[in-house]
Amino acid sequence: MKKKDKHELKPEEFCPIRQTLKTLGKRWTILIIKEAYYSKSQRISFMDLRRRLVNASAKVLSERLKDMVEEGLMRRNVHGTSTPVRVYYSLTEKGKDACRIIEDLKKYGLKWRVKETFNCENMDCELCAKKKEKALQSSLS
């Protein structure tokens, strides 16, 4: 009987879903893509991400952005020659392709997860969030 090499790859390691989740399944990655995609100019600064993703620590957010640039999901753009320079992140084609997954997640959430009556099906996420916030504030008044 032939002994298996401990470094031999298992068939499930070739699974495209598993390979995709190694990148997109990391915490905050999908939400960073969503924020960049729905930002007005389709570029976003680190500080804008910090304001929008309040539960993400600066360290984790920085690490995730670095990973996403290395993976080819985002492009890091430095503007200005004097300090402080401005750094913006924008989606690459690979990153924009992931937005289809976000739309599918939204559809799934609307069908199976969202327990409220607020309907954001035909809105982009940025507009939806603003409308929900406005509705919440008026209900508290």
Task: Walk through the language-model features, giving the residues of each.
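Basic amphipathic alpha-helical segments that dock to polyanions
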Residues: 61-71
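Intrinsically disordered, low-complexity basic tails/linkers immediately adjacent to helix-turn-helix/homeobox/MYB/SANT
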Residues: 55-56, 63, 85-88
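N-terminal helix-turn-helix DNA-binding core of bacterial DNA-binding proteins
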Residues: 15-60
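C-terminal regulatory/oligomerization modules of transcriptional regulators
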Residues: 1-7, 12, 41, 75, ...
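Alpha-helical hinge/cap motifs
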Residues: 24-27, 92-96
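Beta-hairpin "wing" of winged helix-turn-helix
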Residues: 2, 69-90
